[in-house]
Curated annotation (Swiss-Prot):
Pfam families tied to this protein: PseudoU_synth_1
Name of the protein: tRNA pseudouridine synthase A
InterPro entries hit by this protein: PsdUridine_synth_cat_dom_sf (IPR020103), PsdUridine_synth_TruA (IPR001406), PsdUridine_synth_TruA_a/b_dom (IPR020097), PsdUridine_synth_TruA_C (IPR020095), TruA/RsuA/RluB/E/F_N (IPR020094)
Keyword entries, A-Z: Isomerase, tRNA processing
Subunit note: Homodimer.
GO molecular function annotation: RNA binding; tRNA pseudouridine(38-40) synthase activity
GO BP: tRNA pseudouridine synthesis
Active-site residues from the entry: D53
Highest taxon above the source species: Bacteria
Family per record: Belongs to the tRNA pseudouridine synthase TruA family.
Keyword tRNA processing listed: yes
EC assignment: 5.4.99.12
Length: 241
């Protein structure tokens, strides 16, 4: 029996999504598996649509797991929500055994939130406190450089050999003093979204030229984009299957 979970979590309280070698570190995956194993009275291993780093949030993370037991999904959901802290299970359903949260996914959308107004002490764990104006039109000048299937080695600290990824679209929305950057793609490398946003902001500040951004793709070098915005403003916004 395969179950599919849709969850949200506040990344401020976790050392990322994935389990760590140090079992004392609390992660989203370790907490989920602890209480799923308690419910089913057997060890449960889960698979997420992707890993989020520490302080990164999720509005729509998808998780799957297999188990021999057949339970009403609602009873599992109610149990988990009664035990979990800073994680909420939005839904659980039974799915075909071929479903896998990581390998069945078609695309993911990330959202990055920036506060361009005055520093907000109550939102500092949920928005990047940039605290200065952003020229949206200038930001949009370089968006097309990221769209398509490209080698994003310069925008990642990943150890993977294959660093080619596909970005489908990027949208920037301004609401009052907040800037929301949405990035949709088929897959992402570690720190890729945060480094893309970092370069967009650096370009807006006139600290890097259009040609220099272009060169990050023409001559890719691991992590050469350098600028990485804080994890607190990043949300896994939507997972599509």
């Amino acid at each position: 029996m395969t179950y599919k979970l849709k969850i949200s979590y506040d990344g401020s309280f976790f050392r990322g999504y994935a389990k760590q070698k140090d079992e004392n570190l609390i992660t989203v995956q370790s907490e989920l598996e602890k209480y799923l194993s308690l419910f089913f009275n057997t060890k449960i291993s889960t698979f997420g649509s992707g890993r989020t780093d520490k302080y990164v949030h999720a509005i729509d993370q998808t998780v799957s797991f297999k188990c021999d037991s057949d339970y009403d999904p609602k009873s599992i959901q109610n149990f988990l929500n009664s035990k979990l802290t800073n994680i909420y299970v939005n839904s659980i359903e039974k799915v075909p055994n071929s479903f896998h949260a990581r390998f069945s996914i078609k695309s993911k959308t990330y959202m990055y939130v920036i506060n361009t107004g005055e520093f907000d002490v109550f939102k500092q764990r949920y928005e990047y406190q940039y605290n200065k104006s952003i020229d949206i039109k200038k930001c949009e000048d370089i968006i097309n450089l990221f769209i398509g299937t490209k080698d994003f080695l310069s925008f990642s600290t990943s150890k993977l050999e294959n660093t080619t990824r596909t970005i489908r679209w990027i949208r920037i929305i301004k609401k009052n003093k907040k800037i929301y950057i949405f990035i949709n793609g088929e897959g992402f490398l570690r720190n890729m979204v945060r480094m893309i946003v970092g370069i967009i902001l650096t370009y807006c500040e006139n600290k890097i030229t259009y040609q220099e951004v272009l060169d990050l793709f023409k001559n890719p070098k691991k992590g050469s984009a350098v600028i990485k915005v804080p994890g607190c403003g990043l949300y896994l916004y939507r997972t599509i299957y």
